[in-house]
Amino acid sequence: MGVPERPTLLLLLSLLLIPLGLPVLCAPPRLICDSRVLERYILEAKEAENVTMGCAEGPRLSENITVPDTKVNFYAWKRMKVEEQAVEVWQGLSLLSEAILQAQALQANSSQPPESLQLHIDKAISGLRSLTSLLRVLGAQKELMSPPDATQAAPLRTLTADTFCKLFRVYSNFLRGKLKLYTGEACRRGDR
């Protein structure tokens, strides 16, 4: 009986060891490169913008909040290296995250915060954290640490938001604009 048990033991051991190599061989594609993932975050941002746009007076912020400028000069953008795009997107995403957190703090200090507004703020915070993690896979954070040419790195253009509607509009436009352009190009090139 000793002879038949050896092949069974070897088969069992090989079956146990095979899955150790599977994560490397069958790694899931980078999630940020799946357009449906980014579209989900864009949809959430657009919903938040629509909810706050519905209020005629709109929930106002008690102080102005600095947000990234979302305008894109497509000619200049296409001429930028992907590393430069990464720096601009990472800086914009960081500033947007700070702005949403600041808005959350201002909302918490208001007398009667609307529940739906708080829900969208929470979703935005969660979405920005997820997007930040997904961008790390593309190496956007590494580019921020060592920009291609620090002397030519232009300062991030900003503007101010005084209402939640404007804040969520900037959030939505940033995701649909610079973030989508950068991830599309980085995924096409296979950059990490």
UniProtKB/Swiss-Prot annotation:
<dbReference type="GO" id="GO:0007566">
    <property type="term" value="P:embryo implantation"/>
</dbReference>
<dbReference type="GO" id="GO:1902251">
    <property type="term" value="P:negative regulation of erythrocyte apoptotic process"/>
</dbReference>
<dbReference type="GO" id="GO:0032496">
    <property type="term" value="P:response to lipopolysaccharide"/>
</dbReference>
<feature type="glycosylation site" description="N-linked (GlcNAc...) asparagine">
    <location>
        <position position="50"/>
    </location>
</feature>
<feature type="glycosylation site" description="N-linked (GlcNAc...) asparagine">
    <location>
        <position position="109"/>
    </location>
</feature>
<dbReference type="GO" id="GO:0071474">
    <property type="term" value="P:cellular hyperosmotic response"/>
</dbReference>
<dbReference type="GO" id="GO:0009651">
    <property type="term" value="P:response to salt stress"/>
</dbReference>
<keyword id="KW-0325">Glycoprotein</keyword>
<dbReference type="GO" id="GO:0030295">
    <property type="term" value="F:protein kinase activator activity"/>
</dbReference>
<dbReference type="GO" id="GO:0009986">
    <property type="term" value="C:cell surface"/>
</dbReference>
<dbReference type="GO" id="GO:0071548">
    <property type="term" value="P:response to dexamethasone"/>
</dbReference>
<dbReference type="InterPro" id="IPR003013">
    <property type="entry name" value="Erythroptn"/>
</dbReference>
<dbReference type="GO" id="GO:0030218">
    <property type="term" value="P:erythrocyte differentiation"/>
</dbReference>
<dbReference type="GO" id="GO:0033028">
    <property type="term" value="P:myeloid cell apoptotic process"/>
</dbReference>
<dbReference type="InterPro" id="IPR019767">
    <property type="entry name" value="EPO/TPO_CS"/>
</dbReference>
<dbReference type="GO" id="GO:0033033">
    <property type="term" value="P:negative regulation of myeloid cell apoptotic process"/>
</dbReference>
<dbReference type="GO" id="GO:0048678">
    <property type="term" value="P:response to axon injury"/>
</dbReference>
<dbReference type="GO" id="GO:0005615">
    <property type="term" value="C:extracellular space"/>
</dbReference>
<dbReference type="GO" id="GO:0045893">
    <property type="term" value="P:positive regulation of DNA-templated transcription"/>
</dbReference>
<dbReference type="GO" id="GO:0045666">
    <property type="term" value="P:positive regulation of neuron differentiation"/>
</dbReference>
<dbReference type="GO" id="GO:0043249">
    <property type="term" value="P:erythrocyte maturation"/>
</dbReference>
<keyword id="KW-0265">Erythrocyte maturation</keyword>
<dbReference type="GO" id="GO:0010976">
    <property type="term" value="P:positive regulation of neuron projection development"/>
</dbReference>
<dbReference type="GO" id="GO:0051602">
    <property type="term" value="P:response to electrical stimulus"/>
</dbReference>
<dbReference type="GO" id="GO:0042104">
    <property type="term" value="P:positive regulation of activated T cell proliferation"/>
</dbReference>
<dbReference type="GO" id="GO:0005125">
    <property type="term" value="F:cytokine activity"/>
</dbReference>
<dbReference type="GO" id="GO:0000122">
    <property type="term" value="P:negative regulation of transcription by RNA polymerase II"/>
</dbReference>
<protein>
    <recommendedName>
        <fullName>Erythropoietin</fullName>
    </recommendedName>
</protein>
<dbReference type="GO" id="GO:0006357">
    <property type="term" value="P:regulation of transcription by RNA polymerase II"/>
</dbReference>
<dbReference type="GO" id="GO:0033574">
    <property type="term" value="P:response to testosterone"/>
</dbReference>
<feature type="signal peptide">
    <location>
        <begin position="1"/>
        <end position="26"/>
    </location>
</feature>
<dbReference type="GO" id="GO:0043066">
    <property type="term" value="P:negative regulation of apoptotic process"/>
</dbReference>
<dbReference type="Pfam" id="PF00758">
    <property type="entry name" value="EPO_TPO"/>
</dbReference>
<dbReference type="GO" id="GO:0006915">
    <property type="term" value="P:apoptotic process"/>
</dbReference>
<dbReference type="GO" id="GO:0005128">
    <property type="term" value="F:erythropoietin receptor binding"/>
</dbReference>
<comment type="function">
    <text>Hormone involved in the regulation of erythrocyte proliferation and differentiation and the maintenance of a physiological level of circulating erythrocyte mass. Binds to EPOR leading to EPOR dimerization and JAK2 activation thereby activating specific downstream effectors, including STAT1 and STAT3.</text>
</comment>
<dbReference type="GO" id="GO:1902219">
    <property type="term" value="P:negative regulation of intrinsic apoptotic signaling pathway in response to osmotic stress"/>
</dbReference>
<dbReference type="InterPro" id="IPR001323">
    <property type="entry name" value="EPO_TPO"/>
</dbReference>
<keyword id="KW-0732">Signal</keyword>
<dbReference type="InterPro" id="IPR009079">
    <property type="entry name" value="4_helix_cytokine-like_core"/>
</dbReference>
<dbReference type="GO" id="GO:0033189">
    <property type="term" value="P:response to vitamin A"/>
</dbReference>
<dbReference type="GO" id="GO:0097696">
    <property type="term" value="P:cell surface receptor signaling pathway via STAT"/>
</dbReference>
